[in-house]
Amino acid sequence: MEKNIAILMADLSGYSALTETHGATSAADLIDKYIRIAENCLVGDSKMHQRTGDEIMFVSDYPDFLLATALNLEANTTNEENFLQIHGGLHFGKVLNRTDSYFGSTVNLASRIAAKALAGTFWCSDDFVKSLTNKSICAFKSKGSHLFKNINGQKEIYEVSIEKTTTTLVDPICRMLIVNPQYAIHHPNENELYFCSTQCLEEYNKNHNSVHYTEMLDQSENQLILN
């Protein structure tokens, strides 16, 4: 039998970059940490239903509980050193539960919304906002109408407004959060760049120098053509 539930799909932003840079063991350790954090963020009847890669699917019969869970996730991951930013999608609608699996377009749309959300943000459908009992928990910023693959019609989407108390610093190579810059590796020439390790600094310099060298070659070739 179908019933209405709230769904949150929450992904780690930059997980592929982290895996590529620091390897499978570091990636697996990060997932273990993500699960521990998520377990401590659950509100009310919210529960983790399943994990696929770096995405966790949360479900609740009450949208207010799931929104509170999402806010906890953002707050706890933002302050976690050497972690990744999180992004997610929230939706409310009918699903079919069979052998502890959920089926229906509600699941698909929640996943599609999560895929569009930028790092450090949660986006939600108008159905989710309308289903909230207490809409004063936080503000919602309209992101306009969106089309989603394999979803009929346009959907009005909102961003959950989360007040940022500090500037978010991110390692440009592995995408890890730099919570305490005083303990990170500071780029000697670019003031705004911090790295989790000398490995990432060296990788950045290698890539940057390679791009700079290519640009110089292009400029030289263009100059020869003009002459």
Language-model regions, residue ranges each:
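Short linker/helix segments within small regulatory modules
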Residues: 184-192
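Short Cys/His-rich "knuckle" micro-motifs
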Residues: 181-184, 207-208
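Short, charged, amphipathic alpha-helix that recurs within catalytic cores of restriction-modification
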Residues: 106-113, 129-131
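Short amphipathic alpha-helices in soluble, non-transmembrane regions
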Residues: 69-75
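Cytosolic regulatory/linker segments at or just downstream of nucleotide-handling modules
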Residues: 122-173, 180-181, 199
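Catalytic NTP-binding/metal-coordinating core of nucleotidyl cyclase/transferase enzymes
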Residues: 1-68
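Catalytic core of nucleotidyl cyclases, primarily class III adenylyl/guanylyl cyclases
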Residues: 43-65, 79-106
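Short metal-binding segments enriched for Cys and/or His
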Residues: 198-218
